Amino acid sequence: MPRPTGKKFDKRRQQQNPLFKRKKFCRFTAAGVDQIDYKDTETLKDFIGENGKITPARLTGTKAHYQRQLDTAIKRARFLALLPYTDQHKA
């Protein structure tokens, strides 16, 4: 069976994946970071979701080496009350 080409193939491809996915890259590798600091709360907040969970590497594009450091840094910052455990404390 011949491979589909032309406009039909392009339409079919767009229908399968309607959202454009940007190529993921590791922010820490690009910046040349050696160690992730637990005191840098602004950077750490970017990797915490709305519900307070740590965003996985498959969504952020962070390399495994830095994801482990990020996990430890967030947990340390939470323990020292630099970051909240949850996003909103509702009474």
From Swiss-Prot:
PROSITE patterns (alphabetical): RIBOSOMAL_S18
GO molecular function term, any single one: structural constituent of ribosome
BP terms from Gene Ontology: translation
UniProt xrefs under SUPFAM superfamilies: Ribosomal protein S18
Keyword entries, A-Z: Ribonucleoprotein, Ribosomal protein, RNA-binding, rRNA-binding
Keyword rRNA-binding part of the UniProt annotation: yes
A Pfam match: Ribosomal_S18
GO cellular component, one term: cytosolic small ribosomal subunit
InterPro entries in the record: Ribosomal_bS18, Ribosomal_bS18_CS, Ribosomal_bS18_sf
Keyword rRNA-binding: yes
PANTHER family the UniProt entry points to: 30S RIBOSOMAL PROTEIN S18, SMALL RIBOSOMAL SUBUNIT PROTEIN BS18M
Subunit: Part of the 30S ribosomal subunit. Forms a tight heterodimer with protein bS6.
Purpose of the protein: Binds as a heterodimer with protein bS6 to the central domain of the 16S rRNA, where it helps stabilize the platform of the 30S subunit.
Family of this protein: Belongs to the bacterial ribosomal protein bS18 family.
Protein's recorded name: Small ribosomal subunit protein bS18
Originating organism: Burkholderia ambifaria (strain MC40-6)
Gene that produces this protein: rpsR
